[in-house]
Amino acid sequence: YTSAEMSCFMIGDIDVDAIEAQIKKMFSDIPAQPNAAKREYYPVNDNKEPIVLVYQDKEQSNVQALIFNKHEATPDEQKGDMGYLVQNYATTLINNMLNARLNELVQTANPPYIYAATYDDDFFVAKTKDAFTGVVVCKEDAIENGIATLLRETERARQFGFTETEYNRARAEYLRQLESAYNERDKRKNEEYVDEYVRHFLDNEPIPGIENEYAI
């Protein structure tokens, strides 16, 4: 950790000039380290055969399985255009529609799992590879059926997509949440701003602001 790799965020009802001066006073004298280690981003190789890891924890009463499908991460320099926001919108709705299907199966008389969901994000802590990830939680004697159901529903969505009704429902919910965030924009908590700025600093995630997102 060096000063060149750090940032400081101050959020709140503050005197900007006074706080900025105080931050400069506290941190400007920290010297740069001429021999600091270079920050490296290592590639994550693809694999043809599945890599399986099993970990046992006696305190866990249920079994959890995570299935990662790796894919290339969006380069930081491509995250500043409208195409990236459109990509995020599509990814969000795809996962929301698939998760709605998975949740419906929990409501059946004989559910295949206790919980199941999908999301798309970093592959563990890697910055050079993302992963479409499926999570399923089952009783110990139902793990095979739980994993099979998760994979089957994911493949069904990949091959045949979703219905217009599913899309309209997911889109309406997405817009409802966006409108709610816009209407409550003056009540946002400080940590919500901090989270946005941290993601921008570390991963170059855009910060369009709720006003612009709502307008788009």
Which stretches of residues belong to each language-model region?
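M16 family metallopeptidases and their MPP-like homologs
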Residues: 4-11, 61-82, 102-216
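An aromatic/glycine/proline-enriched structural segment found at the starts
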Residues: 7-62, 172, 176-183
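Long, His/Glu/Asp-enriched segments that create or flank divalent metal/ion-associated functional microenvironments
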Residues: 85-87, 91-95
